[in-house]
Amino acid sequence: MVDSTEMTENKPSDWFFNQRSFPLDTIPQSFYHEQVIRVQKLAKSRNRKNIQPWKFAGPTNIGGRITDIEASAPDPGLIYIGSASGGVFKTKDFGLTWTPIFDQNPILAIGDMAIHPSDPKILYVGTGEANGGGGSVAYDGNGIFMTNDGGLSWKYLGLEFSGSISKILIHPNNPQIVYAAAMGKLFSKNPQRGIYKSINGGDTWELIYFQSDSVGVIDMAMDIHHPDTLYAATWERSRNVFGINYGGAGSGIIRSFDGGKIWSPSTLGLPEGDNIGRIGLAVSSTEPNKIFAQYVDSRGNFLGIYRSDDFGHSWSKPGGRINSAGFDWWFGKIYVDPKDANIVYSLGLTAYKSTNGGQQFFPIADNSNEEVHVDQHALFIYPDNTNNLLLGNDGGLYHSMNAGGNWRKINNLPITQFYTCHIDYSHPERLYGGTQDNSSMRTLTTRVDQWAIISGG
């Protein structure tokens, strides 16, 4: 089934994608990979010929889509962010300065990251954006990478054809055990999707859950007190140049109590049927019997937040209402405060918070006051001070010191996605560009931090 409303819309991503995929229905990963390497070699050749090198022009004051955030409680200045198509950036001074640490990889679309529980220099990075999008460009990845020196060097860990890595979990007591959820390729069916497990730090992987070549796993959660207890959200999803199908009977929740050897569906009290879409999962650290699930239907409408108080045996709907954006497959994540099982955060067009276990939700990142950009994709809650939050969305990175009461934007991240750009030939310092989710913008100076939005949304 294809959503016909999507077929009739002419989105920037359709124009952008069709230019690069014609006459095919997809952009083969190998083609994309080869062209990036070709451009990198061309840049080196130009340098040898004393041709004027490229100069960074910005913007650093606009931002772009963030897909994941990892930070270190022992080292409060250290933050890693993963972006939709700009790779991984690292800061040691809480965002005053950023360093790209993943640029040597030809594919810079990031799905998820995981930081080692005791060594923040060890970071796993899963490539391929898991947010499928409808009016945006989303790229597949080329597997998982790991650094043990904070990004100075990287080791490739395989899973080349997994499409997008939506979640990475590291066993808290035995960090050699790593789980990876794979959504598969976005624009085609493929069997390299499901849940993978490694018992040697990613050197080798075993596929421990597979449903079909059109059903991937969009989220996973672990009971940190009993790390063999795992919960996963499956998502039946497909997209092509003619339309999207973001739901089906293959979407649902599964669980395992033996480290992934046996999986069983968790259905009692949950929605079922052909219209189930994206699902987000979170397990309470303080009360691991409590699990929260955020449900969206196949058309992107919000279905509700469900809670289990018995390790996923049964579910109920606490009743908290959240406004639907109508394209909620674009977000879909849910988080629980590490110190309080009653505090729950739901990410959508804006960010919502509940302080009573999901019975009521209220917005904490409402764009009506121009304080926070829309489309929330990632949240990091500092475990030692849960009032300290980092929020990632289509507009970049934001910081709150009072559990979402107020937000401050952290700039200097050059991750804006441009569809096209133009130079004023009479005044070459004047640059113009059209971007994904950050409007049309311009700069009238040579300053990288002096870009301004002039139209669009």
Please identify what each model-predicted range represents.
Residues M1-G457:
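Beta-propeller blade termini and top-face loops
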